């Protein structure tokens, strides 16, 4: 039983009309740890008990059975609980050590499907640093959902349809060199795309050429289909190489082209329900009652817009997966669009429209510079990951020249550093990326957290102890309690991250645990002869528990935890 449950049960004994759940949601953690481990505010009792909250706190504190606590005291309108450090600490450690992989997990999902769409790069263009945010936020959310008992279904909705591919084909037909494409397909195709956009300013006919090629693709022209399939194949091959580096794996790569085959159904429903309204030659859905701008469905030239594919996709996914939630990890510039998508689905009569969730995020800049594929100043993600690994390798060789499997550790540290930097920031905030800062072993970085755990693992190896089943875990003191009580917050942290779809809660937790452990490591004597053997073993059990929890937290962020660095 965790500390919060002990507090809830002690309170229910003196508040019999309250359920455990009602009490549980009111229990807080004091901002100042000197005020106790938990606090219960009495404001909501004032009306029924007809007393001032301060008096209620004093009265209840006197009635509470203090057997499981060091002390219970009233401070103003709050009842503050100080847990029995040795007994509660031993119980927390036992729970971690007994089943480290599942520590912190709560079966809140009961196996329900949650679709998570993320990454979604465009074919025939390299994955840039701009894709990192969607990819890693989405992957972390999927891992957090799995930890909480949901079944995440990971979807990479490839940008493999649209007028830009017509432009790519037109550019290829004008300037394409097959030898160059075979050698470096994506970067060569990108150079054509950048060139046609640049030169279209003086040659507007290039834009028309692009539209014609896309029209050919829509109507099944064999050459257009051949080029499209080729562009898609070489792109996906390259994307999977980057995903393997990041340890990201999808259940589906069906993209916009797949959805384009199903557009007739949503348009049919919109027509049958009389939702399509003529406006300046186009057809729109009026969403004024939702305080949203009108949604263009069919352009004045008769072609459908992006929304028809997204409507068709949402309908297909609900029918295929019966999802509990369908999450889209897409930049915050699309917020209004996803509100329109939900509103349109509601108008079409789908009661599951509110289960569509848009997880937005802020833009990433590189050393203060914005990125744009259209203008050609995209920063290649694969190049950044490789450079980060090289930097990590250099630092590791300086710290530990004789490290075995140094190359593998360099990959784990270098790639982990890039991922951790992305995820430690609240997802809606814009972030700036500076590689040298990101890979440092000091400060709020991934390598700092990884190194803290590696130090703990080194201590455990030196001790030679691998089994703590006979350890007297009540031998922990105040120094250990600082770590153990913080590890008890892990489950709440995971739940908060899940409810807010915010992996930064996990990253911040991992950083704080690493900081507390480093302080403990620096000030506590463990592997010395004059420390009592029972105390020594209890302290090593704490080190083992910290190692388990840091590894678990990093895994939720898709960051590796090397045992040596």
UniProtKB/Swiss-Prot annotation:
Q: What is its main location?
A: cytoplasm
Q: Among the record's GO biological process terms, what is one?
A: arginyl-tRNA aminoacylation
Extract the Pfam families matched here.
Arg_tRNA_synt_N, DALR_1, tRNA-synt_1d
EC number(s) on file: 6.1.1.19
Q: Has UniProt tagged this entry with the keyword Ribosomal protein?
A: no
Annotated GO CC locations? cytoplasm
- For the motif 'HIGH' region, give the residue ranges: 121-131
Coiled-coil annotated residue ranges, if any: none
What is the protein name given in its UniProt record? Arginine--tRNA ligase
The organism encoding this protein is Lactobacillus delbrueckii subsp. bulgaricus (strain ATCC BAA-365 / Lb-18)
């Amino acid at each position: 039983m965790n500390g919060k449950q002990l507090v809830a049960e002690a309170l229910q004994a003196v508040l019999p009309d309250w359920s455990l759940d009602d009490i549980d949601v009111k229990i807080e953690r004091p901002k100042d740890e000197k005020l106790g481990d938990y606090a219960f505010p009495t404001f909501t009792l004032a009306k029924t008990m007809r007393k001032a909250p301060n008096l209620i706190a004093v009265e209840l504190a006197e009635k509470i059975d203090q057997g499981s606590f060091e002390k219970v005291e009233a401070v103003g309108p709050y009842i503050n609980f100080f847990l029995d450090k040795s007994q509660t600490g031993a119980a927390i450690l036992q729970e971690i050590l007994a089943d480290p992989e599942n520590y912190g997990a709560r079966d809140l999902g009961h196996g329900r499907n949650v679709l998570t769409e993320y990454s979604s790069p465009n074919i025939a263009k390299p994955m840039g640093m701009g894709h990192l945010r969607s990819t890693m936020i989405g992957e972390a959310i999927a891992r957090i959902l799995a930890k909480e008992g949901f079944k995440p279904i990971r979807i990479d909705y490839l940008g493999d349809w649209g007028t830009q591919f017509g432009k790519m084909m037109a550019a290829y037909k004008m300037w394409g060199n097959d030898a160059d494409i075979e050698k470096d397909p994506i970067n060569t195709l990108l150079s054509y795309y950048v060139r046609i956009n640049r030169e279209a300013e003086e040659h507007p006919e290039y834009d028309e050429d692009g539209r014609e090629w896309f029209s050919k693709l829509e109507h099944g022209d064999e050459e257009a289909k051949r080029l499209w399939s080729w562009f898609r194949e070489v792109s996906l091959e390259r994307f999977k190489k980057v995903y393997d580096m990041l340890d990201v794996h999808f259940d589906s790569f069906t993209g916009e082209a797949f959805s384009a085959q199903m557009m007739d159904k949503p348009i049919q429903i919109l027509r049958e329900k009389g939702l399509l309204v003529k406006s300046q030659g186009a057809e729109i859905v009026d969403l004024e009652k939702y305080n949203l701008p009108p949604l263009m469905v069919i352009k004045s030239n008769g072609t459908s817009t992006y929304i028809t594919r997204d409507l068709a996709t949402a309908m297909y996914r609900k029918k295929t997966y019966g999802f509990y939630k369908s999450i889209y990890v897409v930049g915050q510039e699309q917020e209004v669009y996803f509100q329109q998508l939900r509103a349109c689905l509601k108008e079409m009569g789908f009661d599951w429209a509110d289960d569509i969730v848009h997880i937005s995020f802020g833009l990433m800049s590189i050393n203060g510079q914005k990125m744009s594929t259209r203008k050609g100043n995209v920063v290649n993600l694969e190049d950044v990951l490789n450079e980060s690994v090289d930097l990590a390798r250099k630092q590791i060789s300086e710290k530990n020249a004789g490290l075995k499997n140094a190359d593998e550790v360099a990959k784990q540290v270098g790639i982990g550093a890039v991922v951790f930097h992305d995820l430690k920031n609240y997802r809606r905030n814009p972030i700036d990326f500076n590689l040298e800062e990101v890979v440092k072993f000091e400060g709020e970085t991934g390598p700092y957290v990884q190194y803290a755990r590696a130090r703990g693992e080194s201590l455990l190896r030196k001790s030679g102890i691998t089994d703590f089943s006979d350890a007297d875990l009540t031998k922990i003191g105040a120094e250990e309690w600082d770590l153990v009580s913080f590890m008890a917050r892990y489950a709440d942290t995971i739940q908060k991250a899940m409810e807010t779809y915010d992996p930064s809660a996990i990253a911040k937790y991992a950083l704080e645990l690493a900081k507390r452990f480093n302080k403990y490591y620096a000030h506590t004597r463990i592997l010395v002869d004059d420390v009592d053997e029972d105390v020594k073993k209890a302290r090593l059990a704490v080190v083992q528990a910290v190692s388990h929890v840091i590894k678990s937290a990093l895994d939720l962020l898709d960051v590796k935890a090397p045992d040596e660095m």
